Amino acid sequence: MLEALLLGVVEGLTEFLPISSTAHLMLIGDMLGFEGPPGKTYEIVVQLGAILAVCVVFRQRLWGVATTITQPRSFAFARNVMVAFLPAAVIGATLYKYIKQMLESPLVAAIALVVGGVAILVIERLVKRARIHDIEDMSPALALGVGFCQVLAMVPGVSRAGATIMGSMLLGLDRRAAAEFSFFLAIPTMCGASAYSLYKNWATLSFDGAGLIALGFVAAFLSALVVVKGFIGFVGRHGFAPFAWYRIAFGSLMAVLILMR
């Protein structure tokens, strides 16, 4: 029970921060021996818990877009999210086997954590003035650019949130808009990834310990709820440097532990 609760909390806390939930789940899951088909079922379900948190926090905005989709700004919002989703959908489905092989390499994740941390520090220094303050004001080409940045997150340890937020900032979005776009882009991306993973692993999935899986879902939902509500305010005050230094420290520790085996 403690293992399921811990991994659910880790998923919820790390999924929407630029620190790679995959790397954290990989290391902690390996330490706890939480692997195999039941582990895959658990991984898929807890991701859905994290997605639900975004939908709950931004429910009014999502509902507003859905009910006014024919209006120009609502249409632009939905268009930009879906355009940004396309590269990951197409490339992810095409390269699924290779991505799965990479996901089995904790050392790759550790190196990506460190490299990504350094990249965040560099980008924070490079980006001085944003020119886009709302998702609706993005062009389709810019949204597509963010989508290709998201593809980088297929390498474990890169972080989907980190790649999309930093990519958005490099392309002209301010911190708040970049963070929000990353949240909204997570909805189709994570739902699509979960659905594709279900399809590919259906024959080996197991719902043994359904109670523990449900516990992980709830833990991921509640912890993600806290993160999503507080993240934008935090980066507005402190920027992304704290996450960069954490990545470098955690990635280095992860690499040392792996090499000491």
Curated annotation (Swiss-Prot):
Transmembrane segments: 1-21, 38-58, 75-95, 103-123, 138-158, 178-198, 212-232, 240-260
UniProt main location, coarse: membrane
Catalytic activity reported: di-trans,octa-cis-undecaprenyl diphosphate + H2O = di-trans,octa-cis-undecaprenyl phosphate + phosphate + H(+)
Signal peptide, first to last residue: none
Swiss-Prot/TrEMBL GO biological process terms: cell wall organization; peptidoglycan biosynthetic process; regulation of cell shape; response to antibiotic
InterPro entries named in the record: UppP
Keywords: Antibiotic resistance, Cell inner membrane, Cell membrane, Cell shape, Cell wall biogenesis/degradation, Hydrolase, Membrane, Peptidoglycan synthesis, Transmembrane, Transmembrane helix
Membrane topology note: Multi-pass membrane protein
GO cellular component: plasma membrane
Cellular compartment(s): Cell inner membrane
Record EC number: 3.6.1.27
GO molecular function: undecaprenyl-diphosphatase activity
Function comment: Catalyzes the dephosphorylation of undecaprenyl diphosphate (UPP). Confers resistance to bacitracin.
Family statement: Belongs to the UppP family.
Additional remarks: Bacitracin is thought to be involved in the inhibition of peptidoglycan synthesis by sequestering undecaprenyl diphosphate, thereby reducing the pool of lipid carrier available.
Classification via PANTHER family: UNDECAPRENYL-DIPHOSPHATASE
Name of the protein: Undecaprenyl-diphosphatase 2
Species, as recorded: Paramagnetospirillum magneticum (strain ATCC 700264 / AMB-1)
Gene that this polypeptide is encoded by: uppP2
